[in-house]
Amino acid sequence: LAADDLNADGFDDLAIGAPGEAFGTRTNVGMSHLLMGSANGLTTAGNYAVAQGDGAPGAWAGGERFAASLATGDVTGDGAADLVVGTPGDWVRSQRSAGSATVLHGSPSSRVGTNASVLTQSGALPGGAEANDAVGASVAVGDLDEDGYGDVIVGAPDESFGSSTGAGMVGIR
């Protein structure tokens, strides 16, 4: 669960992770349900869901567990909170369960996920993508360097370091 003002309307919205959500015969694909806030609290109007291939980059694949972890904060500095979604089972460069974190940018004029950034160890995060690293098993947002922008913090509990398997890693972007 994560709550913040994703559409900059002055009311907190609620993101609910459903990493076990299935699509057809594919199990544990994952999805995030977004409930929009209003002056009267959470409403049924304007609610929607985001999944890989449906509002977020990527494609539906079993076992990826999209939305296993969630965090919010204004990463872009535009006044709308952004939603960070952990996908610890994501395939990255043919590496099963290497994992990723996706920043779904909040906006007053469009749905979360219209613009997105995917963070993996084959790009924005330190290290190289390896099978079973589980990048995105935990995510957080905080302004660690006090520059006014939220920094994305991504955990990978099964990252190996040298000959130490499962040593873990925290990446900050």
Model-derived regions: residue spans:
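Generic detector of contiguous secondary-structure segments
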Residues: F11, R26-N28, A68, P88, ...
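Hydrophobic beta-strand segments that make up the repeating blades of beta-propeller
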Residues: L14-A18, L83-T87, V152-A156
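Beta-propeller blade termini
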Residues: L1-F11, A67-A80, G136-Y149
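Blade-edge motifs of beta-propeller repeat domains
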Residues: M31-R65, S100-A134, A167-R173
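Short glycine/acidic-enriched loop and turn motifs that connect beta-strands
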Residues: G20-T25, G89-S94, D158-S163
